[in-house]
Amino acid sequence: MEELAVEVRGSNGAFYKAFVKDVHEDSITVTFENNWQQEKQIPFHDVRFPPPSGYNKDINESDEVEVYSRANEKEPCCWWLAKVRMIKGEFYVIEYAACDATYNEIVTIDRLRSVNPNKSATKNSFHKVKLDVPEDLRQMCAKDSAHKDFKKAVGAFSVSYDSENYQLVILSVNEVTIKRANMLCDMHFRSLRTKLSLMLRNEEASKQLESSRQLASRFHEQFIVREDLMGLAIGTHGANIQQARKVPGVTAIDLDEDTCTFHIYGEDQEAVKKARTYLEFAEDVIQVPRNLVGKVIGKNGKLIQEIVDKSGVVRVRIEAENDKNISQEEGNVPFVFVGTKDSITNATVLLDYHLNYLKEVDQLRLERLQIDEQLRQIGASSRPPSNRPDKEKGYLSEDCSGTVRGSRPYNNRGRSRRGTGYASGTNSEASNASETESDHRDELSDWSLAPAEDDRDNYHRRGDGRRRGGMRGQGMRGRGGFKGNDDQPRPDNRQRNSRETKARTSDGSLQIRIDCNNERSVHTKTLQNASVEGSRLRTGKDRIQKKEKTDGVDGPQVVVNGVP
């Protein structure tokens, strides 16, 4: 509330600044500046108004002035009457008039002013009006803010409520204030009554709102987001916060930027937790075995991008080996996922599932390799050892097939047709490039159908010692085939479906080995009296010549699968 400032004369003759509190018959009640003295009544003749604003005269030597100074350290500054004795530039030598002894002081112009033209106040200098307040408005009139407009309208410097007498006290220095106050009092009280009614309603509504908020804010979630992730949590132009506020049941969301703390208030726990999922961003590290990093990333990053898209994480990065900020386990590479808690959980589920799949696949492949190795070892151990020295073996070894000089080669060479009792002698390593898996199975079946030694003895042989050709086609043609009549009986006592490995006796044998890859090797062993000329391979021409020579030599012949 604005107060009327006056100057009050003290016992030393100086004037102190004070404010009018109340007006009486012959005095006024004032309060002093900074409350250096208690509130007290001052008679009118010791009270005057301050000089008008802008009032200032030129100060010359021998002029009476007022100096703003203090008598001691306990009292505030006040205005003392003095006289100018000398002027030196901006400095003035003054002599105080209130002192018994001559007292001079040098002051500047900012502490000087001309003598106050206002005289002491009188009874007519102040006007006071009292208005009785209705009972229903007494509480309303006790508020100083309720009379702000009324005070301005009547031109008063003070409007206060006297709680003892239930009156509205109006103080003014203008006589017109009394007339205006009496004229506006009814209107003022009526407006106060309307304001009071509205204020009571607003207060009641505010109380209901506060109680509703307290009821609605029973559920509260508080969490902290890392400072470098606050931008993601807030979202572009606060999009994430707006989305969280739209969750049904959420009443308020507050953010403490200094501590990066979110406060979520809601009507139920589910709404609060759902809003939290939109705002709680974090970073999590998943360790991936180093040998599976490439398979996790995929070609052109396809697999890791699928994990990012399906999980909803913001980004994923693979930390370098020399990064000390992320703890690295030996043999693992850290994958760092950034996003909401739910999205990181989804990414962890997807990545763990994929890692388990890759580990199971590797385990199955390892088991297959172990089984293959065991089969290979079993096949090698089941083969009978050779009695010949290494120098006489030539090209015959465990892993390859060939013929020994002095033995008869197979008759089915080139493009000739094979009978049911014949088998190919092609090296497994040379045939793998052109044979399919189905060919291996067919050829394996052909080997299993090879007749035993006893069965081969029952075949009718030609006069020159060669076996009849296979029964293929109407003309029964084929290289080495017999073109004679087929009226001779043929015994059917051989086993056609035998799959057992056939091995001949030591005096002229054929060994057949089938490994786990359906590869086969044919090993032939000549008679003891067969000559061995070397361990080199023979060309087709050499084979023909050797065949002709063998046909003309008297003596035993080596028979392979019944073919000389």
From Swiss-Prot:
Record field: compositional bias (Low complexity): 426-435
Domains (record comment): The C-terminal disordered region undergoes liquid-liquid phase separation (LLPS) for the formation of a membraneless compartment that concentrates mRNAs with associated regulatory factors.
Ranges where the record places region Disordered: 377-510, 529-564
Protein purpose: Multifunctional polyribosome-associated RNA-binding protein that plays a central role in neuronal development and synaptic plasticity through the regulation of alternative mRNA splicing, mRNA stability, mRNA dendritic transport and postsynaptic local protein synthesis of target mRNAs. Acts as an mRNA regulator by mediating formation of some phase-separated membraneless compartment: undergoes liquid-liquid phase separation upon binding to target mRNAs, leading to assemble mRNAs into cytoplasmic ribonucleoprotein granules that concentrate mRNAs with associated regulatory factors.
Keyword Ribosomal protein carried by entry: no
InterPro entries linked: Agenet-like_dom, FMR1, FMR1-like_C_core, FMR1_C2, FMRP_KH0, KH_dom, KH_dom_type_1, KH_dom_type_1_sf
SUPFAM superfamilies assigned to the protein according to its UniProt record, in alphabetical order: Eukaryotic type KH-domain (KH-domain type I)
Residue numbers spanned by region RNA-binding RGG-box: 468-481
Listed PROSITE patterns: AGENET_LIKE, KH_TYPE_1
Subcellular location: Nucleus; Nucleus, Nucleolus; Chromosome, Centromere; Chromosome
KH domain: residues covered: 222-251, 285-314
Comp. bias (Gly residues): 471-483
CDD domains linked: KH_I_FMR1_rpt1, KH_I_FMR1_rpt2, KH_I_FMR1_rpt3, Tudor_Agenet_FMR1_rpt1, Tudor_Agenet_FMR1_rpt2
Similarity remark: Belongs to the FMR1 family.
GO biological process: animal organ development; DNA repair; glutamate receptor signaling pathway; membraneless organelle assembly; miRNA-mediated post-transcriptional gene silencing; mRNA export from nucleus; mRNA processing; mRNA transport
Main localization (coarse): nucleus
Domain Agenet-like: 4-50, 63-115
Protein name: Fragile X messenger ribonucleoprotein 1 homolog B
SMART domains with a match to the protein in the record: KH
Gene Ontology CC entries for this record: axon; axon terminus; cell projection; chromocenter; chromosome; chromosome, centromeric region; cytoplasm; cytoplasmic ribonucleoprotein granule
Subunit structure: Homodimer. Heterodimer.
Basic and acidic residues compositional bias, start-end: 484-505, 535-552
